[in-house]
Amino acid sequence: MARLILLRHGQSAWNLENRFTGWTDVDLSPAGEAEALAAARLIRDEGLDFSVCHTSMLTRAIRTLHLVQHELDRLWTPVRKHWRLNERHYGALQGLDKRETAARHGEDQVFVWRRSYDVPPPVIAPDDPKHPVHDPRYADVPPDVLPCGESLEATVARVLPYWYDAIAPDLMAGRDVLVAAHGNSLRALVMHLDGLDREAVSRLDIPTGLPRLYELDAALRPVSYRYLGDPAEAEERARAVAAQGRLEKN
């Protein structure tokens, strides 16, 4: 039976500041580093291991993975980095404070941008310096496939080819796999694995720094899945993710 561990990166500096991050490359906060180390201990306490790792091209996910590997003495484990595992691209919203954006545009509009399935955020133009076409890490990616702002639907369409081309073959070959990625790229994988419809995945919240363990049958269908550690903590962290972008109630 194949095992797959999905791990959202630890809290980033912009998670802490409640900003839309997307493809902006920010590092972990000190709390995020602690979350990554705690995730490693949860994996160790369960007696789990992994023989190959996948992550995005963004520092917060890469550093989370490296902290886990170091804590478990697994820095030698092969790592494959790919842009298709990057976070959803939030277009012109990237860098903006979520609550300030809700105050300016309305909480309902921000909710639609964040949580709807097929509505993209305001996009950025290809000549914008923040467009990924200007980032050397994507120099080998055809410019016409680099996003300027994505809906969750577009993120799913971007992520799933990597599942079929890279992650699934590793699992089918009998390798236990760790994927360290982002809230929305992991939502795309969970949608596929769990057979969620668009309404269900729009309500799904992935907490930072908590490993989600899948046991998969020979056809890569989930036999079981759960968050490692305290279920109440997973629920609390997921609620915190859901609350981002809501205005304070007086």
UniProtKB/Swiss-Prot annotation:
Q: Which chain positions carry the site (Transition state stabilizer)?
A: H182
Q: Record's Pfam families? A: His_Phos_1
Q: Does the keyword Isomerase apply?
A: yes
What catalytic activity does the UniProt entry give for this protein? (2R)-2-phosphoglycerate = (2R)-3-phosphoglycerate
Cysteine-cysteine disulfides? none
Q: Name one GO molecular function term.
A: phosphoglycerate mutase activity
What SMART domains would the database entry show?
A: PGAM
What are its GO biological-process terms? gluconeogenesis; glycolytic process
Show the active-site residues.
H9 (tele-phosphohistidine intermediate), E87 (proton donor/acceptor)
Keywords (A to Z) from UniProt: Gluconeogenesis, Glycolysis, Isomerase
Question: E.C. number, please?
Answer: 5.4.2.11
Record: residues binding substrate: 8-15, 21-22, 60, 87-90, 98, 114-115, 183-184
Pathway it belongs to?
Answer: Carbohydrate degradation; glycolysis; pyruvate from D-glyceraldehyde 3-phosphate: step 3/5
What SUPFAM superfamilies does the entry give?
Phosphoglycerate mutase-like (SSF53254)
Q: Which CDD domains match?
A: HP_PGM_like
InterPro entries, A to Z: His_Pase_superF_clade-1 (IPR013078), His_PPase_superfam (IPR029033), PG/BPGM_mutase_AS (IPR001345), Phosphogly_mut1 (IPR005952)
**Source species, domain of life:** Bacteria
Gene3D superfamilies the record matches: Phosphoglycerate mutase-like
State the oligomer form and interacting partners. Homodimer.
The protein's role, per its UniProt record: Catalyzes the interconversion of 2-phosphoglycerate and 3-phosphoglycerate.
Family as reported in the entry's similarity comment: Belongs to the phosphoglycerate mutase family. BPG-dependent PGAM subfamily.
Protein name per UniProt: 2,3-bisphosphoglycerate-dependent phosphoglycerate mutase
State the organism of origin.
Answer: Nitratidesulfovibrio vulgaris (strain DP4) (Desulfovibrio vulgaris)
